[in-house]
Amino acid sequence: MASESLNRPLRVADFIATRTSDDDRGPAVFMHPDDARSRLLTDGELAWVYGPRRHELATVHIEPGIRPGDVTVRDITGIAPSEIVRVVKPDLDSRGRRPPTSYA
């Protein structure tokens, strides 16, 4: 229950679709500093963005101008404005689904 209060769902306020000719492109999530802090995320870090149809890794960008509880996503397939998403820091410390280090 404590983890649920730290990772509240976020509303997609805006969606940015880029073109191949754009310099700045690729999966990204823009969020308010308070929302990032509660998820232990920093600017430039990768995070999982879980949408209603799929999930994808995206670069986190911290933007003070975005309303708390809202996010703007860029180039994340399967997410549309007004949908609810969760942004989760990857768990790199647990051993789940990693290939074995020795085969002996």
Protein language model regions, located:
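Long, contiguous, secondary-structure-rich segments that constitute the structural scaffold
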Residues: 1-104
